[in-house]
C-alpha cells in the first residue's frame, strides 16, 4: 500500500484515483502528524511513502525520518514545487508540477530499487 501525504486536497484526490486505477492500493493524508499516526499503527502495511515537502505539523523530510525510525529503508518520494536535494539515502525527489506518468515511473523505480 502507498501512503500519499499532501495538503492540497485536489492533488491528493487526483493521485489517489490515478494510482488506484493502475492497481495500487492507496491511503491518503493531508497532514504530516495524521500520516505519522496512521503509519505508527501499522508500519508494515505500507510499501512506500509519497509526501509533499511542505506540510502542516512538520515537513515531509522529517515525516520520512520518523517513519524510518519504525521501518528503516522505507522507500520514499518527496515532491515539491521548490528545488530540493534529499538528505536521506533512498529518497527520490519529484519536482512539481509533474505529470501523473512521471509519478508512476518514480514509484516503480523506487519500489524496484528497494527490493
Residue ranges and their predicted role:
Residues 7-9:
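Two-component His->Asp phosphorelay active-site signatures
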Residues 13-21:
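Charged docking surfaces used in two-component/phosphorelay signaling
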Residues 16, 98-111:
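C-terminal output helix
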Residues 52:
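Active-site residues of response regulator receiver
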